[in-house]
Amino acid sequence: MAFSSGNSGGPMADINVTPLVDVMLVLLIIFIITAPLMSHKVKVELPEANLIQKEDAEKRAAPITLAVKEDGSLYWNDEPISKEALESRLSTAAQQTPQPPLNLRGDRTTKMRTINEITKIAQGQGMLDVGFVATKEKGQ
């Protein structure tokens, strides 16, 4: 009596996954070995914070915010000011110890020429720390 194996010589229904597993393991090993080599680490020696720097930060004067509108109007800490009064206030602020930083806030449509003039006035009066204030874009 002969038993049939049930295979009538038709197509094989099972997929042989052994070669796939072998290839995947080789790729995994390659990635594990090369991943540390791909990260370029730049060695930077960062400064260490100490108590003296903290005390210096507490002694700083409050910053001055100077807003410039499109039409050239100026606002000293949200109060309107003329260019003539601006020069006298800047020279007074420049003589303070410690000198307060000047933050320029320009309207989006303000011409760069106007901002440049105000920066020159501030530097001419002796302001050392002049910065610009910008808002972060909504997409970032």
Swiss-Prot record:
First-listed, main subcellular location of the protein, grouped into a coarse class: membrane
Organism: Xanthomonas campestris pv. campestris (strain ATCC 33913 / DSM 3586 / NCPPB 528 / LMG 568 / P 25)
Role played: Involved in the TonB-dependent energy-dependent transport of various receptor-bound substrates.
Gene: exbD1
Gene3D superfamilies noted in UniProt: 3.30.420.270
Membrane-topology descriptor: Single-pass type II membrane protein
Keyword Membrane: yes
Quaternary structure, from the entry: The accessory proteins ExbB and ExbD seem to form a complex with TonB.
Keyword line: Cell inner membrane, Cell membrane, Membrane, Protein transport, Transmembrane, Transmembrane helix, Transport
Transmembrane region(s): 17-37
Membrane topology, Periplasmic segments: 38-140
Cytoplasmic compartment spans: 1-16
UniProt family annotation: Belongs to the ExbD/TolR family.
GO cellular component, one term: plasma membrane
Protein's name in the database: Biopolymer transport protein exbD1
Gene Ontology MF: a single term: transmembrane transporter activity
Places the protein is found: Cell inner membrane
Record has Cell membrane as a keyword: yes
The organism's place on the tree of life at top rank: Bacteria
GO biological process: protein transport
